[in-house]
Amino acid sequence: MTHVLSAVAWPYANGPRHIGHVAGFGVPSDVFSRYMRMAGHDVLMVSGTDEHGTPILVQAEQEGLTPQQLADRYNRVIAEDLHGLGLSYDLFTRTTTANHYAVVQEMFRTVHRNGYMVARKGMGAISPSTGRTLPDRYVEGTCPICGYDGARGDQCDNCGNQLDAIELKNPRSRINGETPVFVETEHFYLDLPALAEALGSWLQTRADTGRWRPNVLKFSQNLLADMKPRAMTRDIDWGIPVPLEGWEDNPAKRLYVWFDAVIGYLSASVEWARRSGDDDAWKAWWTDPAAESYYFMGKDNITFHSQIWPAELLAYDGRGSAGGQPGPFGNLNLPTEVVASEFLTMEGKQFSSSRGVVIYVRDVLARYQPDALRYFISAAGPENNDSDFTWQEFATRTNSELVAGWGNLVNRTASLIAKNVGEIPAAGELTDADRDLLATTSGGFSTVGGFIEAHRQRAGIGEAMRVVGEVNKYLTEQEPWKIKNSDPERMKSVLHVTAQAVSDCRTLLSPFLPHSAQKVHQAFGGVGTVSPLPELREVTDLDDGRPYPVLTGDYRRGETLPEWASHPVVPGTPVAAPTPVFTKLDVAAVVEEELGRLQR
């Protein structure tokens, strides 16, 4: 058994999540976490809403709310979205907890004490019309590296490089379009050059494993070529105070949102441990060198997870050129793998809430089954290349693959057993065809599991559905309905073998399709939970008593979760006439209705 940290990118609390978001961080992390638990590993899956930074400050001002009120609203909305999708977080929390503030400030103090956080003067943007500081995310212009017109003052989303606002060509305010004025200001900078050698050594060990996705590895290696100090504080009054004398009482200086957000993986683990009753439980995932950690996100966040976060960890541990000693958390593990997906587009266009090119998770879940969306993302998502979501393909895949493939196999098998036997029959003497089929389904555990562990989920679900096709083919060729009277014992053997094969397929598909896995289990007389879903729970802050919702759950293997293996079906288990597992869609109606919504 290995302790496996599943660190899931923190959705920003400025609105509901759209399907492009969950295609990058949500479904891939959940499929991996569910499989790893079933395979016997001790998984801790953590995340939460990212609630600091300029966008929330500006949006709250526009809506007549405080930043905390806006964060409270969307913390709940996002938690509900992810709950509906069935993402099995051990803890989904938020970055405005007192616990998170304490962990972040401790990280900053130690990084500063070790000599990797250096105060220096730089240039900050000011709005000429208001005289107020214009945070870097609200300055845009032409990227000096790739020439993209629309780069932000902290990062270019086109090439992924980090920037300073003053580096942009033709800078302008995203709020009112005016040209900002740049004035001198003082900030703390993370000394990346002092950490460059250690970062390069770590990244080389990752490259040597041969496991990282080529695009992620290449991008991360390219970052090493331009290592310069990066500002980790901002001129803003919404965020975590700088925990140093002379700075912490300054209302206009706060820690950079990306400095604090990535520390959330650690603070969420600490909060989970505190809520579990063992304050030190988090250490098994963070300080044990044998533990593994996998970070899931979209490709626009690679920089922060393969450069900034490892640099913070190295600086905290004192492993850069300036030396130093770890703080009270001890030596913290560096990421095992950064699992970044490409982008999902919609009907050939980039997602854009402001332009109405968006499909929110909550809207999909209100009209369609959650496993239909999970299936599309798993089978056709942006794993190694950008992919496009169309309503035509979504509805067609739902009908031809889920309904006509997997759902049809479940329904016809349960119906045949219910009609002809009423219970799972015992098997008589098996034929070569029977043994071949059972070898195919049992062999799927190694193949599908290997694909999931290698973050090749499209191949994994494709192989699982290929096995489903083999079972459907077997049932059609054996024609048990024709031999009820002439050879009832053979009919029972065929139905037993098919029931066993369906059980195996259910397990193979359960990391991808947890909602329907439970339905299939119950359709064949199963009791108890085989595919646990998360709980949306109301809690209070452990330190200041403020209420907020979290996602959590009980995902213990052997108690609520089966082992990743074939489980013998039990003869005599009653089987009643089933109800369809999946809902067939009217493809033309879905396309017309959904495209009409986009145009309204």
UniProtKB/Swiss-Prot annotation:
It catalyses: tRNA(Met) + L-methionine + ATP = L-methionyl-tRNA(Met) + AMP + diphosphate. Is required not only for elongation of protein synthesis but also for the initiation of all mRNA translation through initiator tRNA(fMet) aminoacylation. This is Methionine--tRNA ligase. It comes from the Bacteria. Zn(2+) binds at C143, C146, C156, C159. Its cofactor is Zn(2+). Its EC number is 6.1.1.10. Binds 1 zinc ion per subunit. The keyword Protein biosynthesis applies.
